[in-house]
């Protein structure tokens, strides 16, 4: 990362460099509620994740940045599984801001956790439709 920038600032600079206005506009028109949408696609985010490597502190910082679509999608890709607790998993799935975020969270992180089935069961009985969706997605990855 750049020496003068925090890791989060450097990542956001990279998002900006990879931005795609057509994708961003399409997501906004489709109802994406993020304040900031760069329009970076998932293969590009996976490339960024590969370059960064696993980093729990940065993953948590990205997940907390719920106003930016790409931050929320990148976070599960760089969270080390061995540092991700069941309590944190519960918080992340409950705070996932979109279907897309749930998809990435379940595929890239929750689906490979030893407690994935327990999280799926807990989500299934939730009143939240998004958490119920998470349960179904998670079940499809662990079956």
Regions found by a protein language model. Name each.
Residues 1-143:
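Alpha-helical scaffold domains
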């Amino acid at each position: 990362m750049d020496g003068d920038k925090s890791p989060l600032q450097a990542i956001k600079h990279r998002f900006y460099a990879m931005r795609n206005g057509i994708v961003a506009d399409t997501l906004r028109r489709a109802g994406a509620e993020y304040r900031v949408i760069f329009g970076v696609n998932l293969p590009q985010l996976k490339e960024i994740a590969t370059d960064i490597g696993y980093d729990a502190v940065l993953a948590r910082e990205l997940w907390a940045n719920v106003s930016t679509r790409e931050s929320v999608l990148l976070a599960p890709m760089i969270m080390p599984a061995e540092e991700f607790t069941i309590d944190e998993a519960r918080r992340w799935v409950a705070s996932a801001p979109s279907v897309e975020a749930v998809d990435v969270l379940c595929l890239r992180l929750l689906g490979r956790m030893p407690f994935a089935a327990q999280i799926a069961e807990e989500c299934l009985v939730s009143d939240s439709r998004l958490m119920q969706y998470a349960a179904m997605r998670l079940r499809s990855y662990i079956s």
